[in-house]
Amino acid sequence: MKKIVFTGGGSAGHVTPNLAIIPYLKEDNWDISYIGSHQGIEKTIIEKEDIPYYSIASGKLRRYFDLKNIKDPFLVMKGVMDAYVRIRKLKPDVIFSKGGFVSVPVVIGGWLNRVPVLLHESDMTPGLANKIALRFASKIFVTFEEAAKHLPKEKVIYTGSPVREEVLKGDREKALAFLGFSRKKPVITIMGGSLGAKKINETVREALPELLRKYQIVHLCGKGNLDDSLQNKEGYRQFEYVHGELPDILAITDFVISRAGSNAIFEFLTLQKPMLLIPLSKFASRGDQILNAESFERQGYASVLYEEDVTVNSLIKHVEELSHNNEAYKTALKKYNGKEAIQTIIHHISEA
């Protein structure tokens, strides 16, 4: 029986692509383990999947000054020792890393044990963890073809993003019943990220009188961002977040308005949903969402509205453009085969 160790954490985006791959390896009878941090979100997610989880010390890698930067390098070194010992006991054939600060000690620990390390980078440019880890990796899978120019060419393999199977199995009829929507009007699903997005939420609600004339709206507004005055608004359903219902909601969705996190937009791409992307500004991020969104716009998958340009009028204008050019977007979206990502990654894992 072949063995694999997965790692990645710090945010759900560094975990969910692993969950897309794991079921296929289970079918092939791989022995699967996961190494993450003591209290990260990856621990909560992975333990629900009935996968052996081993925690290690980890220090956060920051690009800015913080007093914790003095202590955290020592935590990283302890994490490397923890990971080295754990990997020596597990004796995996390969390590697959999805990035995030906890992955660095695991990658180095694997390299010290002479275990092949495969990385996956979701964004156009590598995050700090993967920048450090890539020198210890034998291969790095990229979601965007353009990412190759930022990485050692001899290690890069373009795959796209692995998408969880359950996302593709939504039920339109269940969504209609859950939302109380009509079949007669198209549906727009609006997602501002797990914490929501204040400017997007406010602008969407101001635009409702105009939008609801033609569309039904599902608004995932983030924790603490519900507007009680709109709870009974016909054609408008708001949620802090949804879990099991999301595939059904996406099945009934005609257009998506969203941030431009890589994992989410590749789910929309695989589902062939035209998108209006409002990426996080450079003031709130390292600019990766802007690059992601602009790549999708160039390929005809999405329209981009920059956060500083968001107004009621600009939002309505971009929604109308999505609707008017729906067929052109659909034609472009059909060119992408999302299933190839998992197949390619599984092939290289098996060959490692």
UniProtKB/Swiss-Prot annotation:
One of its GO terms (molecular function) is undecaprenyldiphospho-muramoylpentapeptide beta-N-acetylglucosaminyltransferase activity. UDP-N-acetyl-alpha-D-glucosamine binds at S11, A12, G13, R164, S194, Q289. GO terms for biological process: carbohydrate metabolic process; cell division; cell wall organization; lipid glycosylation; peptidoglycan biosynthetic process; regulation of cell shape. Pfam families: Glyco_tran_28_C, Glyco_transf_28. It is an enzyme of class 2 (transferase). Keywords: Cell cycle, Cell division, Cell membrane, Cell shape, Cell wall biogenesis/degradation, Glycosyltransferase, Membrane, Peptidoglycan synthesis, Transferase. SUPFAM superfamilies: UDP-Glycosyltransferase/glycogen phosphorylase (SSF53756). The keyword Glycosyltransferase applies. GO terms for cellular component: plasma membrane. It is found in: Cell membrane. CDD domains: GT28_MurG. It is a peripheral membrane protein. Pathway: Cell wall biogenesis; peptidoglycan biosynthesis. It catalyses: di-trans,octa-cis-undecaprenyl diphospho-N-acetyl-alpha-D-muramoyl-L-alanyl-D-glutamyl-meso-2,6-diaminopimeloyl-D-alanyl-D-alanine + UDP-N-acetyl-alpha-D-glucosamine = di-trans,octa-cis-undecaprenyl diphospho-[N-acetyl-alpha-D-glucosaminyl-(1->4)]-N-acetyl-alpha-D-muramoyl-L-alanyl-D-glutamyl-meso-2,6-diaminopimeloyl-D-alanyl-D-alanine + UDP + H(+). NCBIfam families: murG, PRK12446.1. PANTHER family: UDP-N-ACETYLGLUCOSAMINE--N-ACETYLMURAMYL-(PENTAPEPTIDE) PYROPHOSPHORYL-UNDECAPRENOL N-ACETYLGLUCOSAMINE TRANSFERASE, UDP-N-ACETYLGLUCOSAMINE--N-ACETYLMURAMYL-(PENTAPEPTIDE) PYROPHOSPHORYL-UNDECAPRENOL N-ACETYLGLUCOSAMINE TRANSFERASE 1. Cell wall formation. Catalyzes the transfer of a GlcNAc subunit on undecaprenyl-pyrophosphoryl-MurNAc-pentapeptide (lipid intermediate I) to form undecaprenyl-pyrophosphoryl-MurNAc-(pentapeptide)GlcNAc (lipid intermediate II). Belongs to the glycosyltransferase 28 family. MurG subfamily. This is UDP-N-acetylglucosamine--N-acetylmuramyl-(pentapeptide) pyrophosphoryl-undecaprenol N-acetylglucosamine transferase 2. The lineage of its organism: Bacteria, Bacillati, Bacillota, Bacilli, Bacillales. The gene is murG2.
